[in-house]
Amino acid sequence: MMRCLAARVHYKTLIVICALLSLLTVLLWNKCTSEKALRFLPRHPQPPPSPKIDSHPQQPQPPEPPPVVGGVRYEEIDCLINDDATIKGRREGSEVYMPFSWMEKYFEVYGKVVQYDGYDRFEFSHSYSKVYAQREQYHPNGVFMSFEGYNVEVRDRVKCISGVEGVPLSTQWGPQGYFYAIQIAQYGLSHYSKNLTERPPHVEVYDTAEERDSRSSAWTVPKGCSLTRVYDKTRATSVRQFSAPENSEGVSLPLGNTKDFIISFDLKFTSNGSVSVILETTEKGPPFVIHYVTTTQLILLKDRDITYGIGPRTTWTTVTRDLLTDLRKGIGLSNTKAVKATKTMPRRVVKLVVHGTGTIDNITISTTSHMAAFYAASDWLVRNQDERGGWPIMVTRKLGEGFRALEPGWYSAMAQGQAMSTLVRAYLMTKDDTYLKAALRATGPFKLPSEQHGVKAVFMNKYDWYEEYPTIPSSFVLNGFIYSLIGLFDLAQTAGEKLGRDAGQLYSKGMESLKVMLPLYDTGSGTIYDLRHFILGTAPNLARWDYHTTHINQLQLLGTIDNSPIFRDSVKRWKSYLKGGRAKHN
C-alpha cells in the first residue's frame, strides 16, 4: 500500500515540501538569534509616566552637589567684611576666594587678564608705576633723571604748543591757559634727554633755494601769484620770495610724506600771511588743514581747519611744528581744563601752501626735532625771567584746606630749579653766557622767605627748605624740593667756585636738611607727598605711586653725587614698597 502511495505522489510535490521545511527551519533559527542578541544591548530608561490627577505628591529632591571646575568642587560663601558689609566669595576645600573687583578697591591693588600664546593669565601688581634704572653718575650736561620717557606735549593738561612762543600752555589750574615754568622746563629737559638717548632723526629736505641745482618747478604758482629765487643779504644765501593774495589758491609745494610729521621752515613775512599744511588723516572725509598765521591767536578750530597764531614773523625765524601734536590738540580743543582725547592720526602730509608776501627757505620734514624744542624752552626762560630772577606763575593755586591760597605772581623752587637745569644745559651746548647769567639770577628767590615773595622755609627753626609751593604755613613738598636741589647742583658745578658760590651754599644747606628730614616722609609702606599732617595736624597726604617712584628716581640720582647711606637705604626700602613690602612691626 505504501509503495502505491509513494508512486502516486509526484516527485515535484516532494521538492516543494522539502523547500518549505528548509524555510521554516531558517526562520526559527533567526528568531532565536535575535532574542539572544537583544538581551545584551543597553537598555534606555523608560520615559516617566504622564502625570495624573490622582498621582501621589513627589518627595523633595536632595540639594545639587557643588559645581565642579577643573576637577575641584567649590561653593558660594558669604564673607563678612569688618562687621560692616557682606560680599559673596567662593570656597574650595579649606581655601576661601574673594572677588578681585572688591580686592582692588579695598587694598588699592591692580590686575588684569592678559592672553599669551592663546591662553589667559591674570597679572597682579601692588603698584602701577615703575622705577627707572640710574644709568651712570649724574652730570649737568647729561640725561636729566628719567625725562627721556616724558612726553609733556601729549598731556591732557597741555592746551597746545604756542605758535608764538613754541612752548606748552598749561591748563592744570585754569582752563584759560597760562605759561607754567615747570611744564616748560620739563618740555625742554625731556627733549634734551631724548636727543641724547634716541638715534638721529631722518630728515627729508623738500626745498632749499641755496642749492644751485634746486629748481622751483615743483612749486605750483597760480595766476596772480609769484615765486622767485632771490639773494638775501642778511642770511648771505638764496631764498624763495613769494607773493600770493589771501583770496588766491596760494603758492604750494607738494610734500607727500607718509612717515614723519615734524615740519620745519625758515620764514620772514613782509605782510600779513600764513603757511598752511594739508593733512590726510585716519578720519574719513576731506583732509584737515593746519594754518600758521601772522596773528597772536592761540588756537582755533572750525570744521576741519585748525589755526595757530605764530606772530608777525617780520624777521627771519625758524618755525618747527609737530603736526601730530598740532592736529590732535586742535581736534581735542575744549573749554575745560583737559584736552579731549582723539584717535585721529595723520596719514600723509599732502602739501604746503603760502599766502601773503614774504620769503621762505629750508623746508624739511623729519622724524624728530628735539633740540628745536629744547632751545624754544631755554629761550622762553631767558625772555620771561623777571627782575627778581624768578618766573612768576600767573594763576591762583590752592594747595588745600589750612593753607593760604597762592595769588598770581608766586614763585616755585621747583620751577627755579628745573629752569636752572635747562639753562645750564643750553649754556653748555652753546657757550652763550646769556643762558648762564639767567641761571645765576634764578638763585634770588631762594634767599627770601615765603612771606617776602621768596621760596625759603625753615623747619623746626633749623633746617632750610625750598618750597615748591611757598604757602603760609609752609607745606614742605618733597619732590619739588629735591628738583630744586638738582638745579642748584647743576648751576654750582657749571658756574665754578666763584660764580657758583651762592648756588653751592644753597645746595649744601638743602642737602643737610634733606638727610635729616627724609625719614619723616616714610610711612613704612609708601611715602608722603608733604608734611601737612605735621604742620596742620591733619591726615597725612600720601604720595600716589607715580610720586613715590619719582621720590625713588630722585634719590637714585642724588646717590650718584652723594654717597650718604640714607639715600641708598631709602631707595632699597622704598623700592620694596612697590611690591607690597612693609616695615617691620613691633
Swiss-Prot record:
Variant or mutagenesis effect after changing Y178F: Moderately reduces catalytic activity
Membrane topology: Single-pass type II membrane protein
Outcome after substituting N586A: Significantly reduces catalytic activity
Outcome of swapping Y483F: Moderately reduces catalytic activity
Pathway: Glycan metabolism; heparan sulfate biosynthesis; Glycan metabolism; heparin biosynthesis
Compositional bias annotation for Pro residues: 59-68
Its EC number(s): 5.1.3.17
GO (cellular component) term, any one: Golgi membrane
Topological domain ranges for the Cytoplasmic compartment: 1-8
Protein name: D-glucuronyl C5-epimerase B
Species the sequence originates in: Danio rerio (Zebrafish)
Recorded name of the encoding gene: glceb
